[in-house]
């Protein structure tokens, strides 16, 4: 069993619904990470995803619900335990590894993490970048949460998936802040503003964070609205 298979098997056995590998060369060329130079020791990123509970997502209307907020936090915690386990496994093979938590903001003003989980997931073949900027998997739609592990372990990268949003505009129509511009792309967007009125989205999630039982800058409406999440899955993932 090669190292890529070892890591993917471990991830799936410990809760990941999806796992892929991305080459870090494009990210290093873009020279973006927080802190600067974070990626220097590493050659690959492992993207892990866990599916969100369908029934919880389906009960979202035009704002997040307290049960979605709790589910969001719970899945993030499970992902963080999984990435810690992957790091421990990689270190046992005498390679370097560093976990990027599922939901850690390094730049509060611009709402940026150490590295974009979504960008890594797209390159790792987890899904394509939708008009909402969420990663959309053919089976799960955008109903996933993501985390990342950086490593210098020699792994086999996965191929990105073809964008399948087409003319669909359900996320844009549902967006409570009219943030989604409904701009199509064959690959990915050059930046947030190409796809979103980002200040609209950021302002609305700040507003939602003050609702009773929420306490986080979340929304979930575009997650609920995407046809891929609705059409491709029967039932809900296992409760965690």
Regions found by a protein language model. Give the residues of each.
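Catalytic cores of enzyme domains
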Residues: 30, 68-240
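Non-catalytic, usually N-terminal nucleic-acid engagement modules in DNA/RNA processing proteins
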Residues: 1-73
């Amino acid at each position: 069993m090669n190292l890529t298979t070892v890591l993917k098997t471990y991830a799936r056995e410990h809760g990941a619904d999806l796992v892929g590998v991305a080459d870090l060369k494009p990210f290093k060329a873009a020279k973006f990470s927080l802190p600067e130079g974070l990626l220097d020791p590493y050659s690959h990123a492992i993207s892990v995803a866990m599916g969100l509970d369908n029934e919880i997502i389906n009960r979202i209307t035009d704002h997040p619900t307290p049960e979605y907020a709790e589910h969001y936090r719970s899945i993030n915690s499970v992902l963080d335990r999984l990435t810690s386990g992957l790091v421990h496994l990689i270190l046992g093979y005498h390679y370097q590894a560093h976990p990027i938590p599922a939901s850690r903001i390094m730049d509060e003003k611009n709402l940026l993490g150490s590295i974009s989980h979504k960008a890594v997931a797209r390159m790792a073949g987890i899904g394509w970048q939708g008009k909402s900027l969420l990663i959309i998997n053919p089976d799960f739609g955008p109903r996933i949460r993501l985390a990342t592990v950086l490593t210098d372990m020699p792994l086999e990268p996965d191929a990105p998936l073809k964008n399948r949003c087409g003319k669909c505009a359900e996320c844009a129509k549902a967006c409570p802040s009219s943030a989604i511009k409904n701009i199509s792309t064959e690959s990915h967007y050059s930046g947030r503003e190409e796809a979103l009125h980002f200040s609209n989205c950021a302002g609305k999630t700040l507003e939602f964070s003050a609702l009773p039982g929420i306490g986080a800058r979340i929304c979930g409406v575009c997650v609920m609205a995407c046809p891929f999440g609705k059409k491709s899955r029967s039932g809900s993932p296992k409760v965690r």
